[in-house]
A protein has these predicted regions:
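N-terminal Rossmann-like NAD(P) cofactor-binding subdomain of oxidoreductases
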Residues: 2-211, 242-243, 310, 315, ...
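Charged docking surfaces used in two-component/phosphorelay signaling
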Residues: 193-367
Length: 367
């Protein structure tokens, strides 16, 4: 490794899977982070031994330029777990592998006493692994103690971020849980970056809509129930309500996942109260003033033509949630539109915010 200077007090971070689109987002978002410094990048054997610039410059997919301080980091082989983990205090994992391989790799890193914050779906369903949207279920990180007992670790653990498809409508529904939503229909319109693609390498998406994204609808219907679940006897038990039905559609947009949402409640609130709750909602990250926490978390637009992906996806540096077009419905109580940035809030940025919460609550420290 060449040319990486660590500011005093910062935790050393490794990005495993750092050459892909989400890995690039992690590297970019952490460039000037006040708590974390990228010191190690790991990827496949094909990239190992090259500098980050040599490996990624021809396939850098972000609109911002590659951070100077990571260009000369020599990429390590992600399978060399002890070597990679020995250099860092924390790992962000964004590898593109089979699920069983990801599970084995992430658990191996955790067993080196290195906390792992994962962007992958492989560990979303073990009942002792917290799947966290920090504004919504920060209390679920308490399950880490049960997970550590299972893994036989004192410091290491795995925490995961939920699917990008749910990151707009679950935050919009959460401030309304006092009114007991019972039925939700969400149709998501998902950007091509959610597949790790740009228009340059996916020309088939130009002037095209694909009405199917493998596995997304199952994730979009089930993951919110774990997020709204409760910890009982060392396990996260899924919530039983609301009943959620989704359709997930790929649309020709670079970034930004939008959802058209329909919802019915046991106790129907009035429209003004819904908007008031959206605008007033503050989660633990906002109260703790975490570095990546957007203020406000949710923005409601009165204009009939908002939110829009190009105008609103970067709200709160890509971490804010945009909502609009709240109306009463003929079949459900209400309908509305919501929007989130899928590779920031829905991927790397959400992972960074989870790590900030874990550090603030004492689950991550320097080795």
């Amino acid at each position: 490794m060449k040319g990486v200077f660590i500011m005093a007090g910062k935790l050393k971070v490794g990005v495993v899977g750092g050459t892909g689109m989400v890995g690039q987002r992690f590297v970019a978002l952490l460039e000037n982070h006040p708590w974390f410094e990228v010191t190690t990048i790991a990827a496949s054997k094909n990239s190992a031994g090259k500098t980050y610039e040599e490996s990624v410059s021809h396939r850098w997919k972000l609109p911002t330029s590659m951070p100077e301080k990571v260009k000369n980091i020599v990429i390590k082989d992600a399978s060399n777990v002890e070597e990679v983990a020995g250099e860092v205090d924390l790992i962000f994992c964004a590898v593109d592998m089979k699920k069983d391989e990801i599970r084995a790799l992430e658990e191996a890193y955790a067993k080196t006493e290195t906390p792992v914050v994962s962007n992958n779906s492989a560990h979303r369903w073990p009942p002792d692994v917290p799947m966290v949207i920090p504004e919504i279920n920060p209390d679920h990180i308490r399950i880490i103690e049960a997970q550590r007992k299972r893994l036989g670790t004192k410091r290491g653990f795995i925490a995961v971020k939920p699917n990008c498809s749910i990151q707009s409508y679950v935050p919009a529904l959460h401030p309304l849980m006092d009114y007991a939503p019972v039925k939700v229909v969400a149709c998501t319109y998902q950007a091509i970056s959610g597949a790790g693609k740009t228009f340059a390498d996916w020309p088939e998406m130009v002037d095209n809509v694909i009405p199917y994204i493998g596995g997304e609808e199952e994730k979009s219907e089930q993951e919110p129930l774990k997020i709204w679940g409760q910890i009982k006897d060392g396990a996260i038990v899924k919530a039983e309500k609301p009943l959620i039905s989704t359709q997930c559609i790929r649309v020709p947009v670079t970034d930004g996942h939008m959802a058209a949402v329909y919802v019915s409640f046991e106790k129907k609130p009035d429209k003004e109260e819904i908007i008031r709750r959206w605008r007033a909602f503050e989660g633990v990250p906002q109260k703790l003033d975490l570095p990546s926490a957007p203020k406000p978390f949710i923005t409601y637009y009165e204009e009939e033509n908002r939110p829009q992906t190009r105008l609103d996806r970067d709200l709160g540096n890509g971490m804010g949630i945009s909502v609009g077009r709240l109306r009463e419905d003929t079949l459900f109580d209400y309908k509305f539109i919501s929007l989130s940035h899928n590779t920031v809030r829905g991927a790397a940025g959400g992972g960074v915010l989870i790590a900030e919460l874990l550090k603030a609550e004492g689950y991550i420290q320097a080795k």
